[in-house]
């Protein structure tokens, strides 16, 4: 089963996402913010993918990824936000899969997770 760590600070949205992802066959661990996600990630790895809200208290999705990438971790990652725009260089540099704009459909979310997981399994380029 594909393990996903979800970090979303809005309780209702977090609950909806967990239920939807579980219904789609994912095993989901949920965190209320970026700091809790970091603690859960380190304690319960391996995860196949991270699904991160960009705008959270503590650590943003990008800040969390910078920490993990700095430790050499290449876990698949999808960021979603109501208003985030990333430059292609920053997105590639952090190894972020698709960046999704809220609201997002479960179909789009699942497709993004599968794409990010497949990309993370490929060997890094030169």
What does each model-found stretch correspond to?
Residues 15-23:
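Charged docking surfaces used in two-component/phosphorelay signaling
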Residues 79-81:
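Hydrophobic/aromatic residues positioned on beta-strands within the core alpha/beta folds
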Residues 53:
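Active-site residues of response regulator receiver
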Residues 8:
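Conserved acidic carboxylate
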Residues 30-49:
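Acidic, metal-coordinating helix/loop segments flanking the phosphotransfer/catalytic sites
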Residues 104-117, 121:
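C-terminal output helix
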Residues 56:
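Receiver (REC) domain active-site loop signature in two-component systems and cognate sites
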Residues 33-36, 60-64:
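Acidic catalytic/metal-coordinating carboxylates
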């Amino acid at each position: 089963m594909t393990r996903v760590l979800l970090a979303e600070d809005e309780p209702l949205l977090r609950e909806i996402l967990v239920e939807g992802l579980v219904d789609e066959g994912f095993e989901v661990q949920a965190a209320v913010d970026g700091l809790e996600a970091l603690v859960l990630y380190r304690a319960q790895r391996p995860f196949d993918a991270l699904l991160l809200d960009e705008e959270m208290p503590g650590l943003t999705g990008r800040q969390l990824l910078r920490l993990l990438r700095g430790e050499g971790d290449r876990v698949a990652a999808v960021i979603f936000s109501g208003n985030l725009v990333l430059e292609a260089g920053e997105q590639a540099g952090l190894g972020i899969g698709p960046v999704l704009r809220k609201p997002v459909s479960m179909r789009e979310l699942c497709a993004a997770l599968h794409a990010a997981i497949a990309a993370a399994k490929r060997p890094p380029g030169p």
